[in-house]
Amino acid sequence: VSKQSIHNFYINEQQSIYLLSHHDAKKHRQWLNICKKQLSLLGYQDVELIGSGAFGFVFAGVEESGAQWVFKFSRITLAQSVRDRLEDEAYMLSQINNPMVPEFFAFERVKKQGILMMARAKGEDLEQISLKQGRLKPRDLVNLALKLRNVLLDLRERKNGMSLQPVVHGDIKPSNIVWDQQSDAFSLVDWGSSVYAQIDVHGEPVASNIMDLMSSDIASTNARMGDVYFIGDEQMSGARSSPRFDEQGVASTIYALASAQSCRFGAQVIPAASLGLPIEFARVIDGMLSKDKVTRDAAGDYFIRNMPAMAKVYLPDISLPQAKPYIPFWTVQQTDLPDTVVYSSRKQFLRRADHNQQLLDVNDAQLDRYYKEFLFDTGDTEKAFLASISRLAKYPVVGGLSFHWQQESLFVESSLMLHDEGLQDAFTDAVNATVMLAQGIKQKGLFKCCLFDARQTIQLERDETGAYIFEQLPELNYSVSHVAASEVTRPHSYFEDGKDPDEQLQLPKKIIQCVFELNKIHHTGCIIFESLSDRLKIHYYYRLLDAEQEIAFSALLREIIQYTVSIQDYGVAGFMKLPYKNTREFELCTTQQVQYYPKNPKC
């Protein structure tokens, strides 16, 4: 396998600093410390990193008066044209005057480094709140929808002098909305995809003067790519920018928060109508997420026109029975939480190849992500399923999942250990969404994923010749917990799924032999070898379930590490073992059944 083909195996470096090479992690920490030091020298206190994305890093600091500010730094490794976008963002932010939008303060350029300074939005972003709470309550969603509707109205009615000059945010999603639950204030942040709209909601060109209408640019788009998990079809396909883009972002956001997902793609299988929302509100959201443009636009118009009336409906909290997880998981309370990363294999069968969509030149960070994360030739439900697996990895959880689609049924095997009992309800919502999305997939095949702690990842560096550099070999750690023999029916085998067509790394036979021996000992775990030209990464977790076998178990783990230094090939290969056969069977289901908020909640 050539070095170039390694890009087929995508374990996102952004997921954890622990997956960076020692050199890159050191550079990353140094750079963050330089930024913090610079801000401290300018007199700001309590400087902290509060976010990072494809284009830059975001820090917060407090000045002596107590005012809280945000500083957005562009990544200096990006092309100048991309770095210039931070200045564009600063300009667009300076044009907006709305209580839901943080106040612009200044833009500075220090050598190659652009820095945008603005007021800090109070509260926590809705993606984080969603991960902690699970599905948001109908009352909170309707309240949020009204606030977002008001912002959309303000943006589309914006004027430059006497002329209409609508603004498009272009990247509305849960992580770009900050909610201060004490004051119930929402803030719409991150204006990096914002542009002036080229066409209005009716598809007519917007022009502040006759020269704009005569311009040749009227046929080409000025739109910027927002988050590919939330933007609508028109923005994704490069249509001219329109206020309709933000209607799509709002619908995607409400839908994701209502369903405990991190994307818009699941609406065909888990429609808003199945999420316990008020009937009128649910139908509007489903309409806005429709595949038909006429339906979408009509629903968007209805949303803008009728949201104030919908928000007046009395929506008290109703006591619902606690949701039961469709597949079991264990919880333990630990102070040192895992930094979870997911590795998925056997994704190929989810793809629907479209050779007209071959990517030749990716120069957009979001598009790059779209292609790398297997989204460009999969159906919406498959995209939603893969996104739901990624969402599970946002929890402090280790374990494995195996989904097997057969003619009439879906079979799921699992071993999941959640390391924070306080997240049990939210994690249940995320797990159940994953299973429901899997029920909606029609292709027959097998999908496996491992969730491991990146803090435990072992990295062996290589020199220019490919030889490994180490003073002494590290050890594979494991935990021990005893499971009664009566609980074991037929242990899951490392080998029962056969060879994975997605994995190209040829492992030495001695490692395979060790894994074969390990397979005879009752345990759960996974080990993934990710072989790169400059280093070998070993991602793993192990839990021994038969304490009497500990001597043999630890000896085999030592042998595996000794034989890893004979890996010469490039690529990824891995093994996963679930603790015992506890297969759950589900019927395939193309759409979850309708469930609205009750007409009379007092009954």
Predicted features along the sequence, with ranges:
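Catalytic-loop of the protein kinase fold
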Residues: 156-180
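Short beta-strand micro-motifs within the conserved protein kinase catalytic domain, predominantly
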Residues: 103-114
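Regulatory extensions appended to serine/threonine kinase catalytic cores
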Residues: 315-438, 442-457, 464, 468
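AlphaC helix of the protein kinase catalytic domain
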Residues: 126-136
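ATP-binding glycine-rich loop module of kinase domains
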Residues: 61-83
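Terminal C-lobe "cap" of eukaryotic-type protein kinase domains
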Residues: 294-295, 301-317
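Juxta-kinase regulatory segment immediately upstream of eukaryotic protein kinase catalytic domains
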Residues: 2-40
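AlphaC helix of the eukaryotic protein kinase fold
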Residues: 78-95
